Design a protein with these regions (language model features):
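Membrane-embedded alpha-helical bundles of multi-pass transporters/translocases
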Residues: 1-295
Length: 295
């Protein structure tokens, strides 16, 4: 097996930059777009879905859709992992998934913000639910095999550490670019209006992310670095066996709390900046960069 060079590590990490940017768009701006505050509405933001606690008197539409999407994601994760483990493609077990998931992931991210009815409508809510499910399925189909490649491409502890360090950087960079969105759509507002400018911004970002996600597909020959042996175990059989490991259960618990905290931070930051501090949307980027540097 070949050793992964520094250049190849960065080519692999380009994929992380791409999906992190798309993930950042959804995490940072989904709720902000569909549950706008008074400031955003006064600036021309259209209200596309019913507001308030309209789902059983407990959830907002956007909250219910987001929660259902996360539950859907929890079920598809082991299924995609199993399909990838058992893949018999000549190009390896992981790269084919990265190849075919890239375009659906980029498209679904854009379409999440492309409501078919240009006013408050339940049709938009149904469309949003479908697009959110498509997004979560696509990002799972890309990220699960992608993350599985990390220990497979690194043959030693140092190599795996190098890969993890670089992709950590590109993850932060991709998320930071997603936070630049207000600065970019501010330039488009005079020509397209607020909603059109936001959609144009996310479309451009998704196009860049799509290209980045394809970099490891065309630059890394998986079988040159990984001795791929398709697995035969079922998805839920492997999952049950894995959860028998007490240390793994501890890791999963800590990972859950990590993602809950990160999601709360990413979703709430735009509202904190605009609603509480009464600052321009563009300040969101500075707050993210500043807090990331301090952390």
């Amino acid at each position: 097996m070949k050793k992964l060079t520094t250049g190849k590590i960065w080519q692999f990490a380009a994929g992380q930059f791409g999906w992190a940017m798309l993930s950042g768009i959804i995490s940072n701006w989904l709720v902000y777009f569909y549950q706008p505050d008074k400031t955003a509405i006064s600036q021309g933001q259209t209200v596309f879905i019913p507001q308030g606690l309209v789902v059983f008197g407990i959830f907002t539409i956007i909250g219910g859709i987001t929660a259902f999407g996360r539950i859907f994601d929890a079920f598809t994760d082991p299924m995609i992992a199993s399909l990838s483990d058992r893949c018999t493609s000549k190009n390896g077990r992981r790269i084919p998934f990265l190849k075919w998931a890239s375009l659906p992931l980029a498209l679904s991210t854009v379409l999440v913000f492309w409501s078919p009815v240009n006013k408050n409508s339940w049709i938009n809510g149904v469309f949003l639910l479908i697009m959110i499910l498509a997004y979560y399925l696509s990002i799972t189909a890309y990220c699960t095999p992608y993350n599985a490649l990390i220990p497979e491409l690194g043959h030693t502890q140092q190599e795996r550490l190098n890969i993890s360090t670089v992709i950590s950087f590109t993850f932060i960079a991709g998320t930071a670019v997603a936070y630049l969105a207000p600065t970019i759509w501010g330039m488009f507002i005079p020509a397209f209006g607020r909603v059109g400018a936001i959609r144009m911004t996310f479309t451009l970002m998704a196009a860049i992310a799509f290209i980045c996600m394809l970099v490891p597909v065309f630059c890394i020959r998986e079988k040159d670095y990984v001795d791929t042996v398709p697995a035969k175990e079922s998805a839920f059989g492997s999952l049950a066996a894995t959860f028998k490991n007490a240390e793994f259960r501890k890791f999963v618990a800590s990972d859950i709390f990590y993602w809950i905290a990160l999601t709360m931070f990413q979703t709430g930051l735009p509202f904190f900046v605009t609603s509480l501090l009464k600052l321009p949307e563009t300040m969101t980027t500075l707050y993210f960069v500043g807090m990331t540097a301090l952390s």
